[in-house]
């Protein structure tokens, strides 16, 4: 008597799962090809779907890019919010804690490589992007993260460790001085820097930040 063979039944993906599949495929394609060279057909092929299936969830390439950017930006902003809370929640050594925050602020470059590949394309193709995409991305991502950083810096100032009249301005200066040079030199993570160079840039930025915002400093 033969052994009965198991029957494998494929369960069709539901709408929510299929939409996530399209977004993941689009993220990979936009990361490789950028805005100009990405097509809905290429996204459908990457997702293993018919082009009509992609069109069911996203009416055009603009809506798809915006959805991918906002989804990635939300993940990055959430990670940076956690970093600010962890490193500024209880400050014991201001310089060391700010340096640790600076390193943590850079971790999304490696944690979300496809998102930052898209960001690099966005920078290069800014003049060709649909109207409104850049503003919505900035609002959902970088500005949201800086708002949370500003809130934590203001709490640090209330403890007398910093003198910050404008928390939003201070958050912008932190990003500019501490993480900005690493982002710039590494081309948004495309060419990672040696650890010693990253540490040197962060230390220099933190020193400048403390000089600007230490109690009694002249600005």
Give residue spans per PLM region.
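N-terminal intrinsically disordered/low-complexity leader segments
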Residues: 1-17, 28, 80, 217-219
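Hydrophobic/aromatic-rich alpha-helical bundle segments in the mid-to-C-terminal region
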Residues: 10, 116, 135-139, 143, ...
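Amphipathic, non-transmembrane alpha-helical scaffold segments
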Residues: 15, 23, 69, 73, ...
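Helix-turn-helix
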Residues: 21, 25, 29-71
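Short coil/turn segments at alpha/beta junctions that flank glycine-rich nucleotide-binding fingerprints
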Residues: 32-36, 112, 159-160
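Short, flexible, glycine-rich and Lys/Arg-enriched loop motifs at helix boundaries
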Residues: 72-94, 188-194
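Hydrophobic alpha-helical connector segments
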Residues: 81-117, 167-174
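Short secondary-structure transition hinges
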Residues: 96, 103-150, 192-195
């Amino acid at each position: 008597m033969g052994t009965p063979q198991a029957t494998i039944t494929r369960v069709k993906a539901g709408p929510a799962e299929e939409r996530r599949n399209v977004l993941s495929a689009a993220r990979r394609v936009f990361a490789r090809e950028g805005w100009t060279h990405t097509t809905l057909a290429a996204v459908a092929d990457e997702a293993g779907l018919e082009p009509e299936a992609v069109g069911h969830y996203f009416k055009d390439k603009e809506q798809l890019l915006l959805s991918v950017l906002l989804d990635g930006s939300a993940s990055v902003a959430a990670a940076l919010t956690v970093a600010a809370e962890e490193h500024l929640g209880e400050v014991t050594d201001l310089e060391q804690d700010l340096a640790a925050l600076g390193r943590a602020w850079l971790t999304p470059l490696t944690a979300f490589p496809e998102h930052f590949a898209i960001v690099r394309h966005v920078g290069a193709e800014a003049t060709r992007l649909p109207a409104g995409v850049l503003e919505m991305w900035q609002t959902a991502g970088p500005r949201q993260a800086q708002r949370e950083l500003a809130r934590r810096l203001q709490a640090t100032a209330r403890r007398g460790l910093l003198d910050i009249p404008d928390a939003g301005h201070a958050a912008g200066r932190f990003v500019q001085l501490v993480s900005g040079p690493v982002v710039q030199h590494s081309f948004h993570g495309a060419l990672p820097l040696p650890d010693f160079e990253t540490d040197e840039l962060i230390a220099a930025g933190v020193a400048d930040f403390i000089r600007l915002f230490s109690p009694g400093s002249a600005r």
